[in-house]
Design a protein with these regions (language model features):
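Conserved G1/Walker A P-loop phosphate-binding module
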Residues: 1-83, 94, 167-186
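Canonical P-loop GTPase G-domain recognition
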Residues: 118-121, 128-181
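Conserved nucleotide-binding/hydrolysis micro-motifs of P-loop NTPases
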Residues: 39-40, 64-66, 97-99, 126-130, ...
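Conserved C-terminal guanine-recognition region of P-loop GTPase G domains, centered on the G4
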Residues: 51-55, 75-146
Length: 186
């Protein structure tokens, strides 16, 4: 991160983990398109979160990570590695009920193989009626540094996540003022 750059947090996860819903909940506006069809988000969508004391942070919604992308999605998947290596922090968003361990393993390997563990927070989403003690034991390996249980759709548990994001934000007098951007690849 350079002196004049707003810190960026990426939301990385499988399709339909709730990445776009989380961006919209945190930004308090409809920044990302939400759909039940996997890969509704095909491009990186970035918006600015503003906190008290003129602190700012960019939060980016990425397309869902695919283990075996088709010809249409391969361009978007190729850019994910570039994005995560440039990010200041990564939110590894997991649907708490997911059984796609192969897909989660692929993201886990991407994080580990690129030494991104120290800048990754694991966020279990869709946990509105979930008891933490019922977390599948296989999920524990995906926890980096901190784990949170939230419901982006019901806006539960977001206060703890917002506190983490505030700590990562930077005073706006020290950064270029950028409201939002959309990167279209391909």
């Amino acid at each position: 991160m350079t002196k004049n750059k707003i810190p960026e947090v990426l939301i990385l996860g499988l399709p339909n983990a709730g990445k776009s819903t989380l961006v919209n909940a945190l930004s308090k506006r409809k920044t990302s398109i939400i759909g039940s069809t996997p890969n509704t988000t095909r491009d990186k969508v970035t918006t600015t979160l503003e906190f008290e004391d003129e602190k700012k942070l960019l939060i980016s919604d990425l397309p869902g990570f695919l283990e075996d992308p088709d010809d249409i999605n391969i361009k978007f998947q190729d850019n994910i590695l570039r994005y995560v290596n440039k990010a200041n922090h990564i939110l590894f968003l997991i649907d708490v009920q997911s059984k796609n361990y192969s897909g989660l393993d692929s993201i886990f390997k991407l994080i580990n193989n690129n030494n991104l563990q120290n800048k990754t927070t694991t966020v279990f989403n869709k946990a509105e009626n979930f008891e933490i003690e019922n977390l599948d034991k296989r999920m524990y390996k995906y926890i980096f540094n901190t784990e949170l249980f939230i419901s982006a759709y019901h806006k539960k548990g977001l206060d703890v996540l917002e506190n983490i994001l505030k700590k990562l934000s930077k005073k706006s007098s020290n950064v270029n003022d950028r409201k939002s951007s959309i990167v279209i690849v391909g």
